Amino acid sequence: MQRLPEPLKALVEQLSRLPGLGPKSALRLAMTLLKWPASETRRLGRAVHDLRDNLHLCGRCGALTDVDPCGICTDPARSGETLCLVSEWDSLLTLEEGGFYKGQYLILGGLLAPLDNLHADSLELDRLTKRMAEGTVREVVMALGTTVEAENTATYIRNMIVRQYPQVRVTRLAQGIPLGSEVKFMDRETLRQSMQYRQDL
């Protein structure tokens, strides 16, 4: 890297700061960019610039958006009675790709993890409290995963909601054996939850 021209070296250093890109991968990417027409590299530069200047968090749900409130929050076809809690924006994107959920969202901005210094005040619980105070939410769906941190977060939020809004139903995503899997390959906890939450045929 010492013999690289300064502009190339500077770009490689910046690219290698991205997750999953080491110096060699960053150099390959930079060399690819050098082969692009100048108009394309300028377009890429503008897109990166616009990303920082034009994106912000939706004041209602916490999603990344270029308008506030976001398109999901303002969509009249979505039910305001169901509020799905997710830890991060990528979980919202995954649920949206499925096309089966027609309620609204709230992004918590993480999960409770005291060992990592992530406590309740680190989460978007004020935003949740405001949404609940509006009085339209009838069900809160916890779509947080099954890690210890997710379980702790779900329990904490459930207790908070039940205490303040006992009429609101609190649910979680079903857990169990994934589609296409065999029982003999499942871990004990997955089997336990599958048995506990079994369904009628």
Curated annotation (Swiss-Prot):
Gene3D superfamilies: 3.30.60.80, 3.40.1360.10, RecR Domain 1. Pfam families: RecR_C, RecR_HhH, RecR_ZnF, Toprim_4. InterPro entries: DNA_Rcmb_RecR, Rcmb_RecR, Rcmb_RecR_Znf, TOPRIM_dom, TOPRIM_RecR. GO terms for biological process: DNA recombination; DNA repair. GO terms for molecular function: DNA binding; zinc ion binding. PROSITE patterns: RECR, TOPRIM. Residues 81-178 form the Toprim domain. May play a role in DNA repair. It seems to be involved in an RecBC-independent recombinational process of DNA repair. It may act with RecF and RecO. PANTHER family: RECOMBINATION PROTEIN RECR (PTHR30446:SF0). Belongs to the RecR family. This is Recombination protein RecR. The gene is recR.
